[in-house]
Amino acid sequence: IEVETDASEFDAARGAHTGCPGRKSHMGTKADKEKEYTVSELIDMGFKHIQWDGSTPVPIIDCFGRIIAVLAGQPEGSYGSELHEAFCFMQKEASDSGLGKKSKEGPHKCGLFPVLLRGVTMGMGNPHPVSLNPKTMTHLLNRLVGHAAVQRMAKYQNSAFGLWAPRIYEEYRNVHDTMHSKLNLPENFPGTIFAAAAFNLG
């Protein structure tokens, strides 16, 4: 899929590990952000509706042929049922742990659901990588990252990343390997290069 945009003109933050959330002027009013648009409304606004089977990998490229995003698809076999299994498992674990809209981990700027983080971060002013694991939910997070269906999702994402963005992947891998060779830090999914994972338990 080719889009009429130049990736070199995208907004970018200066920090090496800082996200750039976008300008407020581009995000619209509170009502704009909360509105649920229909497909017809989005098309009228200039969006293009692209049919996709959800399985076949499709790269999205800018006007110079640079890959800027990928619809990574999914592997063949029982992957779809495993995704549903992982979803149900996460829902049950969240419910059994008392997580919901009214819990302290509840609604936040990303949605009306609790989010738990596990892994390693270098943010929040830390001079070196530190663990993200919340002490009160360690057992829950250990069960989540240990679940076979969740592990398969992580490994597929890891493989897709390495296939479609090999140079960035190699940089991630080098940092990952260096960090874990020097520091005793948790690793969510052995064999993958992602430092952290966010579990949306809504």
List the predicted regions and their residue ranges.
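Fe(II)/2-oxoglutarate oxygenase catalytic core
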Residues: 1-201
